[in-house]
């Protein structure tokens, strides 16, 4: 009842306050349906009915649609298109098959006929050859018979007849023997290829019949001289013909008669040539004309620069596109500058103009699909550099990412660069194309010839363990004891390596190689990263240390075999079995209780583990040395390294400090939010709006609708996700990431190598995947049950980690970072906390076989294990060379990993990512390890609520909880890439996480980036094309109304040299929800970014300069809001710094205020002084020290009051200053010497009115008693020199020498002391008036 009242009240409130209710009739029904769904969902939560969970999840999926659900729609459309294409192709294939069958039958008939003809020809040739070869012999036989007949002329006829009959019988008998002997020789003739197909009985009969007939014909010919001559001539011709015929037949036999296969191939080649010619003509016609294929309901129209695929002609008629322009120019206010000077940076821009010419309104979404990158290393040689760019592009093989994560994974070494291949050859790596038997034969030959050739290679040497003859002294017992006690598995091993002995020379060498810090250089191609075999003493130390710590019956000796070898080949099986037998033989000689040795193989990672029984101790370690040397003699040609297994433990905080309590009430630090640039300003998609007007308009829109957008994003997610999730998901902005791209993709697998997991947990069962038993795992059924099938979690650590990564989004428990991915939990911990490197490597091999792109490792050790190092290194060859990401926890000892490294977190491979823990106060957790050179990123690891066995939940703390957060974000990035149709490079995914992370400036413990992982920024960057291609965020999604257009800039910013390919897909959907119309525009892009290639033009041609006007379509408001707030950094509010800033701010304001007052007063005083100066020039009111009496001043003031009135100052300014000085201002310039002659008396009198003349007379009269002072003050006004502010000296001495020197007297008479040509004579009152008028004008100016 309460629920009904609650829902009804909400509907009424919505009805009252919603303005557009009257215009929308369907609004009420839609709101009732929405609240009904919420009510049903709430009832399920209250009832907690587990049986109803499946229907709840189905409702959840139907109502949950991410912002970029277009990928799902596009995938379904592509699936439909392929089905129709397959159907139409099937019909076409049936017709083609019929044609092919008819053609094949015709070919077979022709071949059979040709075979019969050839066989018949061969019969004729053989018969002729036999006939010719037997004719002479048979003739001699008949001659003998005829001679015997002619000797008895005298006998009667009867006697002759009997004798003739007997001779004929003998003749037939000898003829048969003659023919059989010739046929026997024919069978032994190697020149006859098809002799087994001949019927020799048939040949015998034919030859015998021909010879007899020929003999009878010759007997009928009677003698005579002419006839005999003819016969001899004939026989001679036959003999010559026989010789010629024999040569011809032998030549034919040597060349060989064409076989059936050859004839068939010739026929097929002829037919294929015909088909190629016809197809070539078809392809040329297709290139010249646009094609239009209608596969049922799917229409495909091909243009020069793009292809349209749709199920409706409306899109073809309404939408027009221009995708041909490639330019570096900017579009109006969207400025993307191009750096002409820096050739190392590359930008490519394509401007797409989309227009709607129809009557419908469409929703437009941009996507990228099938991106590919091909490294240029090894594609072309020096000779190929002469070729053009187009020819080089054609040589680049397109890699089809089929099946993606399906099937069985392998290690692909084909993409090794030239430097890597050279390094593997230096290490003794085998060419995968070379047969191992050939390699062994070469090794044997080298060993046999070793007496004459001293070789340093591994194949020519073998170990000789002999303490008496060893050149290098064995370490002392004390030194060995110290080494044993201070054993540490630092990767910087000693340079002591195994000592090799040349067998025949009996000379000894120390095989020394540069150690190289394997984790001090990210470049795997560095020649310093050479692997060396641990010497036997180190192996013995490892064995004794493991014996001390672990009481087991067997120890695991792991041998890392070369990656290119096939361990399942017969040769490698024989090599391993022989090594095993030799080792067993040695053990049986020294230990009677010993039975046999077992071993384990892991492929494709190529690790061999031999289980050594614990029969050795400190007393018989020499026997262990000898056993290891025997093993090395058998396998050193195939081994890269070897060592005994190490022990690893999980990272879970052992304790929680008081200040780390859950109920900590200490004040939290505050931070300010500042937007960050993902790329350089010239490439950033956040720095496109440079004009002020678009910025102001856009800000107004955002400010007016910001609150509504925030509510829309918040209400987008189901209530359960917000209720059951904790602070850790909100701090890394997972909600907005789900809003953009969804919960993930089931095809993406995350491999959790830990203590196992509860496979029956309600929050894990839906996402956990248990791989079926396969022989490729190469493990026993018991070991398979232990690691894969039933990974029982005794500690709960693995279950907790698994729940953080991918807890199912249901109505119970918690939600993981990526709730819709596939989880593979593998147990390598054999107890509650510890596990060996053999189990860890075996688990990594299972991850490789299952094509898992992400591996979580919330465990580690301070001992460097070379086996694990090599196993992690080989992860970069998974997924067809793309590589797998290894996310590792940094550790919980609050140590600096730069000084005290933990492994595998500090393996410096580009696909390994180390994670530290951060608290909810945006500080590195007190327990977390850090490292300015070894720890990459921060993630929540403080008080994380997640799953534990038996359907329970618990709070754990540690960096083990931080690493799975980064795994989950990586899974979201891989999910977006899967939707786009490709597998990204492992380094590129980690680079995206780094560049989009939130900078935490206030951290005291430093890391490489000092930043927090940002799920929203990483997903958004991947959706916009990744690192090298950036579609502007504001142009990715918008509505295209009738008559509108849109300019879409796409910027490519290549950060690696190579070949980039992708397809920009523009999805077109009508706004009408009932419409099933859908279309896509595919724009292929291919860029070569190696400036060293000839004919490479880094700067594309100049294109059109577009201008954005009012006809431009509007951006999507929600997406634009996300784009503005997706990438930012946090800066801490420092209270002391803030207080100091406030004080300085107010001091600045105060100083500005005081300065303004001072300037105002200064300006007022200057104005007053200028007026007083004018007055003082005509009214001699001087300062203190004037000789004028107070009574004289009062008289003068009284006179001016009578003259100008009471308002003396105002009238004086108006009547005297303006009228008197304005006329002369035009003719008199400041700083110049006045010309007293240029004005006449009349002019001066006209310009000087009566009041001014009176004033001048008063001034002259009053100057009588102080002429010296007055003269100086009157002439002081001439000391200003215009704009140049140049001062002139107008004292008495200078004036008398250069210009004028006036002398005033009581009679108002001016006399000149020195007479010059240019001086003025003053002799009367008129002259005085004239001179004083000129002086007045000068002073006024």
UniProtKB/Swiss-Prot annotation:
Modification comment: Proteolytically cleaved at the N-terminus to generate a 74kDa intermediate which is further processed into a 72kDa form. The first maturation cleavage is autocatalytic, occurs in the ER and is necessary for the subsequent SUB2 trafficking to the microneme. The second cleavage may be mediated by PMX/plasmepsin X.
GO BP annotations, alphabetical order: membrane protein ectodomain proteolysis; protein maturation; protein processing; proteolysis
Q: What is its EC number?
A: 3.4.21.62
Q: Which reaction does it catalyse?
A: Hydrolysis of proteins with broad specificity for peptide bonds, and a preference for a large uncharged residue in P1. Hydrolyzes peptide amides
Membrane topology (UniProt): Single-pass type I membrane protein
Q: Which Gene3D superfamilies match?
A: 3.30.70.2370, Peptidase S8/S53 domain (3.40.50.200)
Using the UniProt annotation, give the residues that carry a glycan (glycosylation sites).
165, 343, 449, 453, 492, 550, 641, 728, 820, 856, 892, 950, 1009, 1105
Organism domain of life: Eukaryota
Domain Peptidase S8: start-end pairs: 726-1019
Q: Where in the cell is it found?
A: Cell membrane; Cytoplasmic vesicle, Secretory vesicle, Microneme membrane
Q: What is the effect of changing residue 960 to A?
A: Loss of the first autocatalytic maturation cleavage. Impaired microneme localization and accumulation in a ER-like secretory compartment
Where are the Extracellular topological domains? 687-1136
Query: Which residue intervals are annotated with compositional bias (Low complexity) in the record?
Result: 430-474, 517-530
Positions annotated as pro-peptide in this chain are: 19-686
Q: Which keywords appear in this protein's UniProt record, sorted alphabetically?
A: Autocatalytic cleavage, Cell membrane, Cytoplasmic vesicle, Glycoprotein, Hydrolase, Membrane, Protease, Serine protease, Signal, Transmembrane, Transmembrane helix, Zymogen
Q: Where are the transmembrane segments?
A: 1137-1157
Query: How is activity regulated here?
Result: Activation may be calcium-dependent. Inhibited by the non-covalent interaction with the cleaved propeptide.
Biological function:
Serine protease which plays an essential role in the shedding of AMA1, MSP1 and MSP7 from the surface of the invading merozoite; this step is essential for productive invasion and the release of the adhesion between the erythrocyte and the merozoite. May cleave TRAMP/PTTRAMP, thereby shedding TRAMP from the merozoite surface during erythrocyte invasion.
Protein's name according to its UniProt entry = Subtilisin-like protease 2
């Amino acid at each position: 009842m309460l629920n009904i009242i609650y829902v009804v009240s909400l509907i009424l409130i919505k009805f009252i306050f919603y303005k557009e209710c009257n215009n929308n009739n369907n609004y009420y029904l839609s709101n009732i349906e929405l609240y009904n769904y919420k009510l049903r969902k709430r009832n399920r939560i209250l009832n907690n009915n587990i049986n109803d969970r499946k229907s709840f999840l189905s409702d959840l999926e139907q109502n949950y649609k991410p912002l970029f659900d277009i990928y799902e729609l596009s995938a379904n459309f592509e699936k439909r298109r392929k089905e129709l294409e397959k159907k139409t192709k099937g019909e076409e294939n049936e017709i083609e098959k019929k044609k092919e069958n008819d053609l094949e039958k015709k070919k077979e008939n022709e071949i059979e006929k040709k075979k019969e003809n050839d066989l018949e020809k061969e019969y004729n040739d053989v018969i002729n050859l036999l006939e010719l070869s037997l004719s002479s012999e048979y003739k001699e036989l008949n001659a003998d018979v005829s001679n015997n007949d002619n000797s008895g002329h005298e006998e009667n006829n009867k006697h002759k007849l009997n004798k003739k009959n007997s001779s004929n019988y003998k003749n037939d008998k000898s003829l048969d023997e003659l023919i059989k002997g010739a046929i026997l020789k024919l069978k032994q003739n190697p020149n006859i290829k098809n002799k087994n197909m001949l019927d020799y009985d048939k040949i015998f009969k034919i030859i015998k019949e021909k010879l007899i007939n020929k003999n009878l014909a010759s007997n009928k010919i009677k003698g005579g001289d002419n006839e005999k001559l003819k016969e001899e001539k004939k026989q001679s011709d036959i003999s010559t013909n026989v010789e010629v015929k024999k040569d011809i037949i032998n030549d034919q036999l040597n060349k060989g008669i064409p076989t059936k296969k050859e004839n068939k191939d010739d026929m097929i080649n002829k037919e294929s040539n015909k088909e190629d010619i016809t197809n070539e003509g078809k392809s040329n016609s297709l290139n010249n004309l646009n094609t239009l294929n209608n596969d049922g309901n799917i229409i495909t129209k091909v243009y020069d620069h793009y292809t349209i695929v749709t199920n409706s002609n409306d899109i073809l008629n309404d939408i027009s596109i221009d995708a041909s322009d490639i330019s570096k120019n900017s579009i109006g206010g969207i400025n993307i500058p191009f750096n002409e000077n820096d050739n190392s940076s590359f930008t490519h821009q394509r401007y797409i103009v989309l227009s709607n010419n129809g009557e419908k309104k469409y929703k437009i979404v941009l996507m990228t699909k099938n991106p590919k990158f091909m490294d240029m290393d090894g594609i072309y040689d020096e000779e190929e550099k002469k070729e053009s760019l187009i020819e080089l592009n054609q040589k680049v093989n397109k890699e089809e990412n089929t099946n993606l994560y399906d099937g069985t994974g392998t290690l692909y070494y084909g993409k090794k660069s030239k430097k890597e291949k050279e390094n593997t050859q230096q290490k003794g790596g085998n060419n995968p194309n070379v047969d191992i038997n050939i390699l062994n034969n070469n090794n044997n030959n080298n060993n046999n010839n070793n007496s004459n050739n001293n070789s340093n290679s591994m194949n020519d040497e073998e170990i000789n363990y002999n303490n008496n003859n060893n050149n290098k002294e064995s370490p002392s017992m004390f030194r060995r004891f110290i080494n044993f006690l201070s054993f540490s598995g630092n990767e910087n091993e000693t340079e002591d390596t195994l000592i090799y002995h040349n067998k025949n020379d009996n000379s000894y060498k120390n095989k020394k190689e540069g150690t190289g810090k394997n984790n001090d250089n990210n470049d795997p191609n560095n020649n310093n990263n050479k692997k060396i075999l641990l010497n036997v003493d180190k192996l013995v130390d490892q064995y004794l240390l493991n014996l001390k710590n672990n009481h087991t019956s067997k120890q695991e000796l792991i041998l890392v075999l070369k990656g290119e070898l096939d361990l399942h080949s017969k040769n490698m099986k024989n090599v391993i079995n022989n090594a095993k037998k030799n080792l067993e033989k040695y053990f049986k000689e020294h230990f009677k209780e010993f039975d046999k040795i077992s071993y384990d193989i892991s492929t494709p990672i190529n690790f061999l583990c031999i289980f050594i029984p614990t029969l050795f101790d400190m007393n018989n370690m020499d026997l262990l040395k000898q056993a290891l040397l025997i093993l090395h003699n058998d396998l050193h040609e195939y081994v890269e390294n070897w060592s005994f297994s190490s022990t690893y433990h999980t990272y879970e905080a052992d304790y929680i400090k008081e200040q780390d309590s859950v109920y900590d009430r200490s004040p939290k630090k505050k931070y300010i939010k500042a937007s960050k640039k993902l790329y350089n300003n010239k490439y950033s998609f956040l720095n496109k709006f440079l004009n002020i007007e678009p910025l102001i308009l856009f800000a107004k829109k955002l400010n007016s609708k910001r609150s509504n957008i925030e509510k829309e994003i918040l209400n987008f997610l189901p209530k359960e996700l917000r209720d059951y999730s904790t602070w850790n998901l909100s701090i890394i902005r997972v909600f907005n990431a789900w809003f953009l791209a969804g919960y993930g993709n089931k095809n993406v697998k995350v491999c959790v190598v830990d203590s196992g997991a509860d496979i029956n947990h309600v929050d894990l069962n839906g996402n956990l995947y248990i791989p079926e038993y396969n022989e490729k795992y190469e493990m026993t059924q018991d070991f398979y049950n232990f690691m894969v099938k039933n990974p029982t979690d005794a500690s709960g650590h693995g279950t907790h980690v698994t729940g953080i990564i991918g807890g199912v989004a249901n109505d119970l428990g918690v939600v993981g970072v990526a709730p819709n991915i596939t989880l593979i939990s593998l147990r390598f911990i054999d107890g509650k906390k510890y596990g060996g490197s053999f189990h860890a490597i075996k688990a990594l091999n299972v991850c490789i076989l299952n094509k898992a792109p992400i591996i979580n490792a919330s465990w580690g050790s301070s001992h460097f294990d070379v086996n694990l190092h090599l196993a992690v290194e080989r992860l970069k060859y998974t997924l067809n060379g793309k590589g797998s990401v290894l996310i590792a926890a940094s550790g919980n000892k609050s140590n600096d990993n730069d000084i005290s490294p933990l492994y595998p977190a500090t393996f410096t491979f580009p696909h390994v990512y180390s994670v530290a823990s951060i608290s909810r106060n945006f500080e590195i957790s007190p327990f977390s390890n850090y490292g300015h050179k070894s720890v990459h990123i921060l993630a929540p690891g403080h008080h994380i609520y997640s799953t534990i066995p038996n359907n329970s939940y618990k709070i754990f703390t540690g960096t083990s909880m931080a690493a799975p957060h980064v795994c989950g974000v990586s899974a979201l990035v891989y999910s977006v890439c899967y939707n786009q149709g490709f597998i990204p490079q492992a380094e590129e995914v980690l680079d995206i996480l780094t560049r989009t992370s939130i900078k935490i400036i206030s951290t005291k413990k430093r890391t490489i980036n000092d930043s927090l992982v940002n799920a929203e920024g990483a997903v958004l960057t991947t959706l916009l094309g990744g690192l090298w291609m950036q579609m502007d965020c504001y142009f990715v999604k918008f509505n295209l109304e009738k008559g509108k257009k849109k300019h879409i800039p796409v910027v490519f910013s290549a950060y690696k040299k190579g070949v980039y390919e992708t397809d920009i897909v523009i999805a077109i959907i009508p706004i009408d929800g009932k419409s099933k119309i859908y279309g896509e525009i595919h724009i292929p892009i291919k860029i070569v970014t190696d400036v060293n290639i000839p004919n490479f033009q880094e700067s594309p041609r100049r294109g059109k300069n577009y201008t954005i006007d009012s006809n431009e379509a509007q951006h999507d408001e929600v997406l634009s809001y996300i784009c503005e707030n997706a990438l930012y950094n946090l800066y801490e509010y420092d209270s002391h710094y803030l207080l100091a800033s406030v004080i300085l701010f107010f001091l600045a304001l105060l100083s500005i205020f005081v300065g303004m007052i001072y300037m105002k007063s200064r300006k007022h005083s200057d104005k007053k002084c200028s007026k007083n100066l004018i007055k003082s020039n005509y009214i001699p009111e001087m300062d203190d020290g004037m000789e004028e009496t107070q009574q004289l001043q009062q008289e003068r003031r009284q006179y001016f009051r009578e003259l100008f009135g009471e308002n003396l100052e105002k009238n004086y300014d108006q009547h005297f200053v303006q009228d008197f000085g304005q006329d002369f201002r035009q003719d008199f310039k400041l700083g110049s010497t006045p010309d007293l002659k240029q004005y006449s008396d009349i002019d001066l009198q006209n310009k000087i009115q009566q009041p001014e003349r009176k004033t001048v007379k008063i001034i002259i009269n009053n100057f009588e008693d102080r002429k010296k002072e007055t003269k100086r003050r009157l002439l002081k006004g001439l000391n200003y020199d215009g704009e140049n502010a140049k001062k002139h000296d107008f004292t008495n001495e200078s004036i008398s020498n250069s210009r004028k020197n006036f002398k005033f007297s009581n009679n108002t008479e001016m006399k000149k002391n020195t007479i010059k040509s240019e001086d003025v004579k003053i002799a009367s009152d008129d002259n005085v008036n004239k001179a004083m008028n000129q002086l007045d004008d000068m002073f006024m100016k």
